[in-house]
A protein has these predicted regions:
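ATP/Mg2+ or Mg2+-diphosphate-binding catalytic cores
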Residues: 39-93
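Active-site-adjacent loop/helix segments that line or gate small-molecule/cofactor pockets in enzymes
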Residues: 330-362, 380, 513
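Glycine-rich loop-to-alpha-helix module at the N-terminal edge of alpha/beta enzyme cores
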Residues: 373-454
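Active-site activation/catalytic loop segments of kinase-like enzymes and analogous catalytic loops
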Residues: 1-19, 34-52
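Zn2+-dependent peptidoglycan hydrolase active-site motif and core
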Residues: 206-250
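Conserved PLP phosphate-binding loop immediately N-terminal to the Schiff-base lysine helix
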Residues: 500, 537-550, 564-588
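Acidic, glycine-rich catalytic/binding loops that coordinate metals and/or anionic ligands
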Residues: 107-133, 252-274, 280-329
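PLP-dependent aspartate aminotransferase-fold enzymes
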Residues: 418-533
Length: 600
Protein backbone atom coordinates (compact mmCIF):
# COMPACT_ATOMS: atom_id res chain seq x y z
CA UNK A 1 0.00 0.00 0.00
CA UNK A 2 1.20 3.50 -0.81
CA UNK A 3 -0.60 4.82 2.29
CA UNK A 4 0.23 2.48 5.16
CA UNK A 5 -1.78 4.43 7.73
CA UNK A 6 -4.93 4.30 5.65
CA UNK A 7 -4.42 0.59 5.05
CA UNK A 8 -4.07 -0.05 8.79
CA UNK A 9 -7.31 1.69 9.79
CA UNK A 10 -9.60 -1.10 8.58
CA UNK A 11 -7.59 -3.60 10.64
CA UNK A 12 -7.72 -1.42 13.73
CA UNK A 13 -11.45 -0.82 13.30
CA UNK A 14 -12.13 -4.53 12.82
CA UNK A 15 -10.03 -5.52 15.83
CA UNK A 16 -11.75 -2.87 17.98
CA UNK A 17 -15.19 -4.18 17.00
CA UNK A 18 -14.32 -7.56 18.58
CA UNK A 19 -11.76 -6.62 21.26
CA UNK A 20 -12.38 -2.97 22.17
CA UNK A 21 -9.21 -0.90 22.45
CA UNK A 22 -8.96 1.61 25.27
CA UNK A 23 -8.00 5.21 24.57
CA UNK A 24 -4.72 4.85 26.42
CA UNK A 25 -3.82 1.85 24.25
CA UNK A 26 -4.40 3.86 21.09
CA UNK A 27 -1.90 6.44 22.33
CA UNK A 28 0.84 3.83 21.99
CA UNK A 29 -0.36 1.96 18.91
CA UNK A 30 1.73 3.91 16.39
CA UNK A 31 4.94 3.18 18.31
CA UNK A 32 3.91 -0.42 18.94
CA UNK A 33 3.52 -1.01 15.20
CA UNK A 34 6.88 0.65 14.53
CA UNK A 35 8.54 -1.50 17.22
CA UNK A 36 7.06 -4.65 15.72
CA UNK A 37 8.48 -3.72 12.31
CA UNK A 38 11.89 -3.04 13.88
CA UNK A 39 11.81 -6.46 15.53
CA UNK A 40 11.03 -8.11 12.17
CA UNK A 41 13.94 -6.47 10.33
CA UNK A 42 16.30 -6.99 13.28
CA UNK A 43 15.44 -10.66 13.60
CA UNK A 44 15.86 -11.08 9.82
CA UNK A 45 19.33 -9.54 9.98
CA UNK A 46 20.29 -11.88 12.83
CA UNK A 47 18.92 -14.90 10.94
CA UNK A 48 21.09 -14.10 7.93
CA UNK A 49 24.11 -14.46 10.19
CA UNK A 50 22.91 -17.42 12.24
CA UNK A 51 21.29 -19.47 9.44
CA UNK A 52 22.37 -17.97 6.10
CA UNK A 53 20.95 -20.90 4.10
CA UNK A 54 17.43 -20.63 5.54
CA UNK A 55 15.87 -17.86 3.42
CA UNK A 56 12.46 -18.45 4.97
CA UNK A 57 13.65 -16.80 8.18
CA UNK A 58 14.02 -13.41 6.47
CA UNK A 59 11.18 -13.69 3.95
CA UNK A 60 9.40 -10.73 5.61
CA UNK A 61 12.46 -8.47 5.72
CA UNK A 62 11.92 -6.58 2.45
CA UNK A 63 8.21 -5.75 2.91
CA UNK A 64 8.85 -4.87 6.56
CA UNK A 65 11.54 -2.37 5.55
CA UNK A 66 9.19 -0.90 2.94
CA UNK A 67 6.43 -0.38 5.49
CA UNK A 68 8.85 0.88 8.14
CA UNK A 69 10.19 3.60 5.83
CA UNK A 70 6.63 4.72 5.07
CA UNK A 71 5.59 4.48 8.72
CA UNK A 72 8.48 6.71 9.76
CA UNK A 73 7.09 9.51 7.56
CA UNK A 74 3.70 9.48 9.30
CA UNK A 75 3.16 12.02 12.08
CA UNK A 76 2.64 9.96 15.25
CA UNK A 77 -0.02 12.39 16.43
CA UNK A 78 -2.00 12.12 13.22
CA UNK A 79 -1.79 8.32 13.38
CA UNK A 80 -3.06 8.44 16.98
CA UNK A 81 -6.01 10.65 16.04
CA UNK A 82 -6.79 8.48 13.02
CA UNK A 83 -6.83 5.34 15.17
CA UNK A 84 -9.16 7.05 17.65
CA UNK A 85 -11.56 8.06 14.87
CA UNK A 86 -11.51 4.53 13.42
CA UNK A 87 -12.49 3.17 16.84
CA UNK A 88 -15.39 5.55 17.28
CA UNK A 89 -13.74 8.05 19.63
CA UNK A 90 -13.40 11.77 18.94
CA UNK A 91 -10.26 11.96 16.85
CA UNK A 92 -8.66 14.63 19.05
CA UNK A 93 -9.09 13.92 22.77
CA UNK A 94 -9.54 17.63 23.56
CA UNK A 95 -12.18 18.34 20.92
CA UNK A 96 -15.09 18.36 23.38
CA UNK A 97 -13.08 20.40 25.85
CA UNK A 98 -12.40 23.06 23.21
CA UNK A 99 -16.03 23.08 22.09
CA UNK A 100 -17.14 23.57 25.68
CA UNK A 101 -14.69 26.45 26.21
CA UNK A 102 -15.71 28.09 22.93
CA UNK A 103 -19.40 27.82 23.80
CA UNK A 104 -18.79 29.94 26.91
CA UNK A 105 -16.87 32.65 25.06
CA UNK A 106 -17.77 34.86 22.10
CA UNK A 107 -15.43 36.84 19.89
CA UNK A 108 -16.37 39.39 17.27
CA UNK A 109 -15.04 39.23 13.74
CA UNK A 110 -14.34 42.95 14.09
CA UNK A 111 -11.66 42.03 16.66
CA UNK A 112 -9.73 40.38 13.82
CA UNK A 113 -10.17 43.40 11.57
CA UNK A 114 -10.84 46.47 13.75
CA UNK A 115 -10.03 48.85 10.89
CA UNK A 116 -12.94 47.38 8.89
CA UNK A 117 -15.40 47.61 11.80
CA UNK A 118 -17.83 45.02 10.43
CA UNK A 119 -19.30 42.03 12.22
CA UNK A 120 -21.88 40.74 9.77
CA UNK A 121 -20.93 38.22 7.10
CA UNK A 122 -21.98 37.70 3.51
CA UNK A 123 -21.39 34.00 2.92
CA UNK A 124 -19.46 33.10 -0.24
CA UNK A 125 -19.88 29.61 -1.67
CA UNK A 126 -16.66 28.37 -3.27
CA UNK A 127 -17.62 24.69 -3.20
CA UNK A 128 -17.29 22.24 -6.07
CA UNK A 129 -20.91 22.88 -7.07
CA UNK A 130 -20.71 26.67 -6.80
CA UNK A 131 -21.91 28.55 -9.86
CA UNK A 132 -20.19 31.67 -8.49
CA UNK A 133 -16.68 30.41 -9.19
CA UNK A 134 -17.62 29.68 -12.80
CA UNK A 135 -15.59 27.61 -15.22
CA UNK A 136 -12.41 25.80 -14.26
CA UNK A 137 -10.48 28.00 -16.70
CA UNK A 138 -11.41 30.99 -14.54
CA UNK A 139 -9.96 29.64 -11.28
CA UNK A 140 -6.52 31.11 -11.89
CA UNK A 141 -7.70 34.38 -13.43
CA UNK A 142 -7.14 36.33 -10.25
CA UNK A 143 -8.10 39.68 -11.75
CA UNK A 144 -11.48 38.28 -12.78
CA UNK A 145 -11.87 36.60 -9.37
CA UNK A 146 -11.12 39.87 -7.57
CA UNK A 147 -13.52 41.75 -9.84
CA UNK A 148 -16.31 39.37 -8.81
CA UNK A 149 -15.37 39.83 -5.15
CA UNK A 150 -15.54 43.60 -5.61
CA UNK A 151 -18.95 43.35 -7.28
CA UNK A 152 -20.26 41.18 -4.44
CA UNK A 153 -18.86 43.62 -1.89
CA UNK A 154 -20.68 46.51 -3.59
CA UNK A 155 -23.95 44.62 -3.15
CA UNK A 156 -23.22 44.08 0.55
CA UNK A 157 -21.14 47.08 1.66
CA UNK A 158 -21.80 46.55 5.38
CA UNK A 159 -20.72 42.92 5.42
CA UNK A 160 -17.48 40.96 5.31
CA UNK A 161 -17.38 38.35 2.56
CA UNK A 162 -16.39 35.07 4.17
CA UNK A 163 -16.90 31.31 4.34
CA UNK A 164 -15.30 28.00 3.63
CA UNK A 165 -15.00 25.73 6.68
CA UNK A 166 -15.10 22.08 5.55
CA UNK A 167 -16.09 23.33 2.11
CA UNK A 168 -15.02 20.91 -0.67
CA UNK A 169 -13.23 22.99 -3.28
CA UNK A 170 -11.52 22.49 -6.63
CA UNK A 171 -9.64 25.80 -6.55
CA UNK A 172 -6.37 24.11 -5.64
CA UNK A 173 -4.79 23.74 -9.06
CA UNK A 174 -1.23 23.08 -7.88
CA UNK A 175 0.08 19.51 -8.08
CA UNK A 176 1.10 19.85 -4.42
CA UNK A 177 -2.52 19.06 -3.55
CA UNK A 178 -2.54 15.74 -5.43
CA UNK A 179 -1.12 12.31 -4.71
CA UNK A 180 -1.55 8.66 -5.57
CA UNK A 181 -3.24 6.81 -2.72
CA UNK A 182 -4.18 3.19 -2.17
CA UNK A 183 -7.10 3.49 -4.57
CA UNK A 184 -5.59 5.75 -7.22
CA UNK A 185 -5.27 9.50 -7.59
CA UNK A 186 -6.76 11.72 -4.91
CA UNK A 187 -6.69 15.44 -4.20
CA UNK A 188 -6.90 17.60 -1.11
CA UNK A 189 -10.19 19.49 -1.42
CA UNK A 190 -11.67 19.96 2.08
CA UNK A 191 -10.98 23.49 3.34
CA UNK A 192 -10.07 23.55 7.05
CA UNK A 193 -10.43 27.23 7.84
CA UNK A 194 -12.55 30.29 7.17
CA UNK A 195 -11.56 32.74 4.44
CA UNK A 196 -12.21 36.46 4.89
CA UNK A 197 -12.08 38.23 1.52
CA UNK A 198 -10.74 41.69 2.26
CA UNK A 199 -8.51 44.22 0.41
CA UNK A 200 -4.74 43.91 0.41
CA UNK A 201 -2.95 45.66 3.29
CA UNK A 202 -5.95 45.13 5.60
CA UNK A 203 -4.47 44.90 9.14
CA UNK A 204 -5.06 41.64 11.02
CA UNK A 205 -5.17 41.63 14.84
CA UNK A 206 -4.80 38.92 17.46
CA UNK A 207 -8.00 37.50 18.96
CA UNK A 208 -6.19 36.18 22.06
CA UNK A 209 -2.95 36.47 23.96
CA UNK A 210 -0.49 34.11 22.34
CA UNK A 211 3.02 33.02 21.47
CA UNK A 212 4.52 32.92 17.98
CA UNK A 213 5.35 29.33 16.96
CA UNK A 214 5.65 29.86 13.19
CA UNK A 215 6.48 32.98 11.15
CA UNK A 216 7.62 32.12 7.64
CA UNK A 217 7.36 32.89 3.97
CA UNK A 218 5.56 29.78 2.73
CA UNK A 219 6.49 30.46 -0.87
CA UNK A 220 5.01 28.62 -3.84
CA UNK A 221 1.99 28.52 -6.09
CA UNK A 222 -1.23 28.11 -4.07
CA UNK A 223 0.68 28.14 -0.78
CA UNK A 224 0.21 30.59 2.12
CA UNK A 225 2.81 33.25 1.33
CA UNK A 226 3.26 35.05 4.65
CA UNK A 227 2.22 32.53 7.33
CA UNK A 228 1.87 33.17 11.05
CA UNK A 229 0.81 30.63 13.70
CA UNK A 230 0.15 31.53 17.33
CA UNK A 231 -0.14 29.24 20.37
CA UNK A 232 -2.76 30.07 22.99
CA UNK A 233 -3.34 28.73 26.49
CA UNK A 234 -6.41 28.81 28.68
CA UNK A 235 -6.79 27.31 32.12
CA UNK A 236 -8.13 24.12 30.55
CA UNK A 237 -6.34 23.62 27.24
CA UNK A 238 -3.86 24.68 24.59
CA UNK A 239 -4.72 25.50 20.97
CA UNK A 240 -3.36 27.35 17.95
CA UNK A 241 -4.58 29.88 15.39
CA UNK A 242 -3.24 30.18 11.86
CA UNK A 243 -3.16 33.31 9.68
CA UNK A 244 -2.34 32.74 6.01
CA UNK A 245 -1.81 34.89 2.88
CA UNK A 246 -0.19 37.90 4.54
CA UNK A 247 2.57 40.24 3.43
CA UNK A 248 5.94 38.65 4.03
CA UNK A 249 7.29 41.74 5.77
CA UNK A 250 4.42 41.82 8.28
CA UNK A 251 5.02 38.18 9.18
CA UNK A 252 8.82 38.16 9.33
CA UNK A 253 8.87 41.01 11.84
CA UNK A 254 7.92 38.30 14.35
CA UNK A 255 10.28 35.73 15.84
CA UNK A 256 9.59 32.33 17.34
CA UNK A 257 8.73 32.78 21.00
CA UNK A 258 7.46 36.35 20.69
CA UNK A 259 4.58 37.06 23.04
CA UNK A 260 1.54 38.62 21.38
CA UNK A 261 -1.11 40.53 23.30
CA UNK A 262 -4.79 40.31 22.44
CA UNK A 263 -5.76 43.11 20.07
CA UNK A 264 -2.23 43.69 18.76
CA UNK A 265 -1.77 44.01 15.02
CA UNK A 266 0.02 40.90 13.83
CA UNK A 267 -0.04 40.94 10.00
CA UNK A 268 -1.33 42.65 6.87
CA UNK A 269 -3.07 40.92 3.98
CA UNK A 270 -1.06 40.52 0.79
CA UNK A 271 -1.98 40.43 -2.88
CA UNK A 272 -0.78 37.94 -5.44
CA UNK A 273 1.83 36.66 -6.15
CA UNK A 274 3.19 37.42 -2.68
CA UNK A 275 0.33 35.60 -0.94
CA UNK A 276 0.74 32.33 -2.82
CA UNK A 277 -1.19 33.45 -5.91
CA UNK A 278 -4.65 34.18 -4.53
CA UNK A 279 -6.99 37.12 -4.54
CA UNK A 280 -6.40 38.98 -1.23
CA UNK A 281 -7.92 37.25 1.79
CA UNK A 282 -7.12 35.90 5.23
CA UNK A 283 -7.17 32.16 5.78
CA UNK A 284 -8.02 31.79 9.48
CA UNK A 285 -7.77 28.35 11.07
CA UNK A 286 -7.96 26.87 14.56
CA UNK A 287 -5.88 23.80 15.50
CA UNK A 288 -5.73 21.67 18.63
CA UNK A 289 -2.37 20.19 17.63
CA UNK A 290 0.59 21.26 15.50
CA UNK A 291 1.31 17.57 14.80
CA UNK A 292 4.93 17.62 13.56
CA UNK A 293 4.63 20.78 11.45
CA UNK A 294 7.15 23.57 12.04
CA UNK A 295 7.10 25.84 8.95
CA UNK A 296 3.78 24.93 7.35
CA UNK A 297 0.39 23.44 8.19
CA UNK A 298 -2.31 21.90 5.99
CA UNK A 299 -5.19 24.24 5.20
CA UNK A 300 -6.87 21.69 2.97
CA UNK A 301 -7.43 17.97 3.62
CA UNK A 302 -8.25 14.79 1.73
CA UNK A 303 -11.94 13.95 1.89
CA UNK A 304 -11.35 10.48 3.32
CA UNK A 305 -9.53 12.09 6.27
CA UNK A 306 -12.14 14.80 6.85
CA UNK A 307 -13.51 13.40 10.12
CA UNK A 308 -10.01 13.34 11.60
CA UNK A 309 -9.08 16.82 10.42
CA UNK A 310 -12.31 18.47 11.54
CA UNK A 311 -11.56 17.20 15.04
CA UNK A 312 -7.98 18.50 14.96
CA UNK A 313 -9.12 21.78 13.34
CA UNK A 314 -12.44 22.84 14.91
CA UNK A 315 -14.83 25.22 13.20
CA UNK A 316 -13.60 28.83 13.71
CA UNK A 317 -17.25 29.84 13.88
CA UNK A 318 -17.39 28.23 17.32
CA UNK A 319 -15.65 31.47 18.30
CA UNK A 320 -17.70 33.93 16.23
CA UNK A 321 -21.13 32.25 16.35
CA UNK A 322 -22.18 33.84 13.06
CA UNK A 323 -25.40 32.53 11.53
CA UNK A 324 -24.01 33.20 8.06
CA UNK A 325 -20.87 31.16 8.73
CA UNK A 326 -22.85 28.29 10.24
CA UNK A 327 -22.75 25.20 8.06
CA UNK A 328 -26.01 24.82 6.16
CA UNK A 329 -27.76 21.47 6.04
CA UNK A 330 -27.71 20.02 2.54
CA UNK A 331 -29.57 16.93 1.36
CA UNK A 332 -27.64 13.70 1.74
CA UNK A 333 -27.38 11.24 -1.13
CA UNK A 334 -30.02 9.12 0.61
CA UNK A 335 -32.32 12.16 0.81
CA UNK A 336 -31.93 12.69 -2.93
CA UNK A 337 -32.58 9.01 -3.65
CA UNK A 338 -35.70 8.96 -1.47
CA UNK A 339 -37.13 12.02 -3.22
CA UNK A 340 -36.44 10.50 -6.64
CA UNK A 341 -38.20 7.29 -5.65
CA UNK A 342 -41.26 9.25 -4.59
CA UNK A 343 -41.49 11.85 -7.34
CA UNK A 344 -39.45 10.78 -10.40
CA UNK A 345 -40.42 8.12 -12.91
CA UNK A 346 -38.59 4.79 -12.88
CA UNK A 347 -37.28 5.42 -16.39
CA UNK A 348 -34.82 7.82 -14.74
CA UNK A 349 -32.67 5.07 -13.30
CA UNK A 350 -29.48 5.45 -11.25
CA UNK A 351 -26.16 3.70 -11.70
CA UNK A 352 -24.15 1.88 -9.02
CA UNK A 353 -25.26 0.34 -5.73
CA UNK A 354 -24.22 3.57 -4.02
CA UNK A 355 -25.21 6.26 -6.56
CA UNK A 356 -22.77 9.13 -6.99
CA UNK A 357 -23.73 12.79 -6.81
CA UNK A 358 -21.92 14.47 -9.69
CA UNK A 359 -21.80 18.27 -9.55
CA UNK A 360 -19.07 19.38 -11.98
CA UNK A 361 -17.37 18.28 -15.17
CA UNK A 362 -13.82 19.03 -16.27
CA UNK A 363 -12.41 17.60 -19.48
CA UNK A 364 -12.30 13.82 -19.16
CA UNK A 365 -13.43 13.88 -15.52
CA UNK A 366 -16.67 14.12 -13.57
CA UNK A 367 -16.40 15.46 -10.01
CA UNK A 368 -18.60 14.54 -7.08
CA UNK A 369 -19.70 16.93 -4.34
CA UNK A 370 -16.44 16.36 -2.47
CA UNK A 371 -14.24 17.17 -5.45
CA UNK A 372 -13.24 13.56 -6.10
CA UNK A 373 -12.45 12.97 -9.76
CA UNK A 374 -13.87 10.08 -11.79
CA UNK A 375 -12.49 9.26 -15.22
CA UNK A 376 -15.59 9.31 -17.41
CA UNK A 377 -15.65 6.32 -19.75
CA UNK A 378 -19.45 6.13 -19.82
CA UNK A 379 -21.08 9.34 -21.02
CA UNK A 380 -21.04 10.31 -24.68
CA UNK A 381 -22.56 13.79 -24.50
CA UNK A 382 -19.34 15.75 -24.04
CA UNK A 383 -17.75 15.39 -27.49
CA UNK A 384 -14.77 17.61 -26.65
CA UNK A 385 -14.62 17.07 -22.90
CA UNK A 386 -16.91 18.10 -20.09
CA UNK A 387 -17.49 21.86 -19.90
CA UNK A 388 -15.09 22.65 -22.74
CA UNK A 389 -14.33 26.34 -22.30
CA UNK A 390 -15.07 27.35 -25.89
CA UNK A 391 -18.36 25.46 -25.93
CA UNK A 392 -19.44 26.93 -22.58
CA UNK A 393 -18.49 30.46 -23.66
CA UNK A 394 -20.35 30.17 -26.97
CA UNK A 395 -23.45 28.93 -25.17
CA UNK A 396 -23.30 31.70 -22.57
CA UNK A 397 -22.81 34.38 -25.21
CA UNK A 398 -25.74 33.18 -27.31
CA UNK A 399 -28.09 32.72 -24.35
CA UNK A 400 -27.33 36.29 -23.32
CA UNK A 401 -28.33 37.46 -26.80
CA UNK A 402 -31.37 35.50 -28.01
CA UNK A 403 -32.99 32.10 -27.49
CA UNK A 404 -35.91 31.46 -29.81
CA UNK A 405 -36.91 29.05 -32.60
CA UNK A 406 -36.30 28.49 -36.29
CA UNK A 407 -39.29 30.50 -37.48
CA UNK A 408 -37.18 33.62 -37.77
CA UNK A 409 -34.22 34.41 -39.97
CA UNK A 410 -30.78 34.11 -38.43
CA UNK A 411 -27.28 33.41 -39.75
CA UNK A 412 -26.42 30.84 -37.09
CA UNK A 413 -28.73 28.08 -38.30
CA UNK A 414 -27.32 28.45 -41.81
CA UNK A 415 -23.73 28.52 -40.53
CA UNK A 416 -24.26 25.34 -38.53
CA UNK A 417 -25.84 23.68 -41.56
CA UNK A 418 -22.84 24.66 -43.70
CA UNK A 419 -20.37 23.26 -41.18
CA UNK A 420 -22.21 19.94 -40.99
CA UNK A 421 -22.64 19.67 -44.77
CA UNK A 422 -18.89 20.17 -45.22
CA UNK A 423 -18.29 16.99 -43.22
CA UNK A 424 -20.72 14.91 -45.30
CA UNK A 425 -20.60 13.40 -48.81
CA UNK A 426 -22.10 15.72 -51.46
CA UNK A 427 -25.20 13.51 -51.76
CA UNK A 428 -26.17 14.41 -48.18
CA UNK A 429 -26.93 18.12 -48.25
CA UNK A 430 -30.39 18.66 -46.70
CA UNK A 431 -30.68 18.99 -42.91
CA UNK A 432 -33.59 18.78 -40.48
CA UNK A 433 -32.94 20.21 -37.00
CA UNK A 434 -34.68 18.51 -34.07
CA UNK A 435 -34.11 18.42 -30.32
CA UNK A 436 -32.66 14.97 -29.70
CA UNK A 437 -31.37 11.75 -31.18
CA UNK A 438 -34.70 10.06 -30.50
CA UNK A 439 -36.50 12.76 -32.46
CA UNK A 440 -33.96 12.45 -35.27
CA UNK A 441 -34.58 8.71 -35.63
CA UNK A 442 -38.32 9.20 -35.23
CA UNK A 443 -38.29 11.72 -38.08
CA UNK A 444 -36.13 9.39 -40.20
CA UNK A 445 -38.67 6.55 -39.85
CA UNK A 446 -41.55 8.89 -40.64
CA UNK A 447 -39.70 10.01 -43.79
CA UNK A 448 -39.13 6.37 -44.74
CA UNK A 449 -42.82 5.60 -44.45
CA UNK A 450 -43.73 8.73 -46.43
CA UNK A 451 -41.27 7.99 -49.26
CA UNK A 452 -41.58 4.20 -49.55
CA UNK A 453 -45.07 3.65 -48.21
CA UNK A 454 -43.64 0.74 -46.23
CA UNK A 455 -43.56 0.10 -42.47
CA UNK A 456 -41.08 -2.75 -42.20
CA UNK A 457 -37.72 -1.90 -40.64
CA UNK A 458 -34.63 -4.12 -40.43
CA UNK A 459 -32.39 -3.54 -37.39
CA UNK A 460 -29.64 -5.25 -35.43
CA UNK A 461 -29.99 -7.37 -32.34
CA UNK A 462 -29.28 -5.27 -29.20
CA UNK A 463 -29.54 -2.10 -31.27
CA UNK A 464 -30.70 1.07 -29.55
CA UNK A 465 -32.18 3.99 -31.48
CA UNK A 466 -34.05 6.13 -28.95
CA UNK A 467 -36.75 6.39 -26.34
CA UNK A 468 -39.85 7.42 -28.30
CA UNK A 469 -42.54 4.84 -29.11
CA UNK A 470 -41.43 4.43 -32.71
CA UNK A 471 -37.74 4.25 -31.74
CA UNK A 472 -38.40 1.65 -29.04
CA UNK A 473 -40.23 -0.43 -31.65
CA UNK A 474 -36.99 -0.74 -33.67
CA UNK A 475 -34.65 -1.08 -30.66
CA UNK A 476 -33.97 -4.68 -29.68
CA UNK A 477 -32.04 -3.36 -26.68
CA UNK A 478 -35.38 -2.09 -25.34
CA UNK A 479 -38.10 -4.48 -26.47
CA UNK A 480 -36.01 -7.62 -25.85
CA UNK A 481 -34.90 -6.33 -22.45
CA UNK A 482 -36.50 -6.28 -19.03
CA UNK A 483 -40.15 -5.19 -19.24
CA UNK A 484 -39.96 -5.28 -23.05
CA UNK A 485 -42.88 -6.54 -25.14
CA UNK A 486 -40.94 -8.50 -27.73
CA UNK A 487 -40.38 -7.82 -31.41
CA UNK A 488 -43.14 -5.75 -33.05
CA UNK A 489 -44.86 -6.98 -36.23
CA UNK A 490 -43.03 -4.62 -38.59
CA UNK A 491 -39.56 -4.89 -37.02
CA UNK A 492 -37.11 -7.53 -38.24
CA UNK A 493 -33.99 -8.28 -36.22
CA UNK A 494 -30.82 -9.92 -37.53
CA UNK A 495 -28.08 -11.29 -35.20
CA UNK A 496 -25.61 -8.86 -33.65
CA UNK A 497 -22.71 -8.73 -36.15
CA UNK A 498 -20.04 -9.47 -33.54
CA UNK A 499 -17.08 -11.48 -34.84
CA UNK A 500 -15.90 -12.28 -31.28
CA UNK A 501 -19.06 -13.32 -29.42
CA UNK A 502 -21.77 -13.29 -32.07
CA UNK A 503 -23.56 -16.05 -33.94
CA UNK A 504 -20.68 -16.20 -36.43
CA UNK A 505 -17.13 -15.80 -35.09
CA UNK A 506 -13.72 -15.34 -36.61
CA UNK A 507 -12.50 -13.84 -39.85
CA UNK A 508 -14.43 -13.72 -43.11
CA UNK A 509 -17.86 -13.93 -41.48
CA UNK A 510 -19.23 -10.65 -42.86
CA UNK A 511 -21.02 -12.52 -45.65
CA UNK A 512 -22.82 -14.72 -43.11
CA UNK A 513 -24.24 -11.66 -41.35
CA UNK A 514 -25.19 -10.21 -44.75
CA UNK A 515 -27.11 -13.44 -45.39
CA UNK A 516 -29.03 -12.80 -42.15
CA UNK A 517 -30.08 -9.41 -43.53
CA UNK A 518 -31.18 -11.15 -46.73
CA UNK A 519 -33.29 -13.57 -44.67
CA UNK A 520 -35.06 -10.56 -43.08
CA UNK A 521 -35.75 -9.11 -46.54
CA UNK A 522 -37.17 -12.40 -47.79
CA UNK A 523 -39.44 -12.75 -44.73
CA UNK A 524 -40.84 -9.28 -45.39
CA UNK A 525 -41.40 -10.01 -49.07
CA UNK A 526 -42.94 -13.40 -48.25
CA UNK A 527 -45.67 -11.50 -46.40
CA UNK A 528 -46.39 -9.46 -49.51
CA UNK A 529 -44.65 -6.35 -48.22
CA UNK A 530 -41.42 -4.54 -49.04
CA UNK A 531 -38.55 -3.19 -46.97
CA UNK A 532 -38.98 0.33 -45.64
CA UNK A 533 -35.52 0.85 -44.13
CA UNK A 534 -32.38 -0.68 -42.70
CA UNK A 535 -31.04 1.11 -39.60
CA UNK A 536 -27.82 0.40 -37.74
CA UNK A 537 -25.09 2.21 -35.82
CA UNK A 538 -21.65 2.07 -37.51
CA UNK A 539 -20.38 0.88 -34.14
CA UNK A 540 -23.01 -0.88 -32.02
CA UNK A 541 -23.09 1.16 -28.80
CA UNK A 542 -25.39 -0.38 -26.18
CA UNK A 543 -24.57 -3.83 -27.52
CA UNK A 544 -21.00 -3.45 -26.29
CA UNK A 545 -19.11 -1.04 -28.59
CA UNK A 546 -19.04 -3.63 -31.35
CA UNK A 547 -17.22 -2.85 -34.59
CA UNK A 548 -18.98 -4.14 -37.69
CA UNK A 549 -17.23 -6.81 -39.78
CA UNK A 550 -15.29 -5.40 -42.70
CA UNK A 551 -17.45 -5.33 -45.83
CA UNK A 552 -20.70 -6.04 -44.00
CA UNK A 553 -22.23 -2.59 -44.23
CA UNK A 554 -21.60 -2.03 -47.94
CA UNK A 555 -23.10 -5.41 -48.89
CA UNK A 556 -26.07 -4.97 -46.53
CA UNK A 557 -26.76 -1.50 -47.95
CA UNK A 558 -26.75 -2.93 -51.47
CA UNK A 559 -29.24 -5.67 -50.56
CA UNK A 560 -31.59 -3.20 -48.89
CA UNK A 561 -31.46 -0.76 -51.77
CA UNK A 562 -32.07 -3.54 -54.27
CA UNK A 563 -35.22 -4.31 -52.28
CA UNK A 564 -36.34 -0.67 -52.43
CA UNK A 565 -35.40 0.19 -48.85
CA UNK A 566 -33.66 3.24 -47.39
CA UNK A 567 -30.38 2.99 -45.44
CA UNK A 568 -30.14 4.94 -42.18
CA UNK A 569 -26.87 5.46 -40.30
CA UNK A 570 -27.61 6.13 -36.64
CA UNK A 571 -24.68 8.31 -35.55
CA UNK A 572 -26.25 9.61 -32.34
CA UNK A 573 -23.69 7.94 -30.07
CA UNK A 574 -20.70 7.52 -32.38
CA UNK A 575 -20.75 10.41 -34.85
CA UNK A 576 -19.49 14.00 -34.77
CA UNK A 577 -15.82 13.06 -34.51
CA UNK A 578 -16.04 10.72 -31.54
CA UNK A 579 -14.26 7.97 -33.45
CA UNK A 580 -11.20 10.13 -34.05
CA UNK A 581 -10.23 8.66 -37.40
CA UNK A 582 -13.30 9.88 -39.26
CA UNK A 583 -16.01 12.44 -38.48
CA UNK A 584 -18.81 9.95 -39.22
CA UNK A 585 -18.94 6.26 -38.40
CA UNK A 586 -20.24 5.27 -41.83
CA UNK A 587 -17.04 6.68 -43.36
CA UNK A 588 -15.15 3.77 -41.79
CA UNK A 589 -17.03 1.46 -44.16
CA UNK A 590 -16.77 3.40 -47.43
CA UNK A 591 -20.55 3.76 -47.78
CA UNK A 592 -22.98 6.65 -48.19
CA UNK A 593 -26.25 6.23 -46.28
CA UNK A 594 -29.50 7.80 -47.41
CA UNK A 595 -30.17 9.35 -44.00
CA UNK A 596 -27.78 10.22 -41.17
CA UNK A 597 -29.16 10.88 -37.70
CA UNK A 598 -27.28 12.64 -34.90
CA UNK A 599 -28.03 13.97 -31.42
CA UNK A 600 -26.46 14.63 -28.03
Amino acid sequence: HKDSLNASLALVKGYHSTFPLEEVELEHLYNAIAMRLVIIVTRAAMSKIEEPDNEYLWISEKPAWEVLKKWNKIAPGFAHYSFREACGYKAHPQQEQFNDWASKNKFNISELFPSIDKNNVQHLDLSVASTWIGHQESFNDLDAFQFKIDQLQKKHPQKIIAGGYLEPRVLYTSSAYDKIGNYGAESRTIHLGVDFWLPENTPVHALFDGEVVCAVNDAGNKEYGGLLILKHKTEELEFYTLYGHNTIASVLKHSIGDIIKKGAQITELANYPENGNWAPHLHFQVMLSMLDYKIDYPGVAYHRQMNVWKSICPDPNLLFKSDELAKKNTPTNNDLIDYRKQHLGKSLSLQYKAPIKMVRGAGQYLLDQFGRKYLDTVNNVAHVGHENYNVVKAGQDQMALINTNSRYLHENINELAKELIETLPPELNVLHFVNSGSEANELAIRMVKAVTGEKDIIASEVGYHGNSNMCIDISSYKFDGKSGNGTPEHTHIFPLPDVFRGKYKGENVASKYVEEVQICIEKIQHKGRNVGAFIIEPIISCGGQIELPEGFLSEAYQLVRNAGGICISDEVQVGCGRLGKTFWGFQLHDVVPDIVTIGK
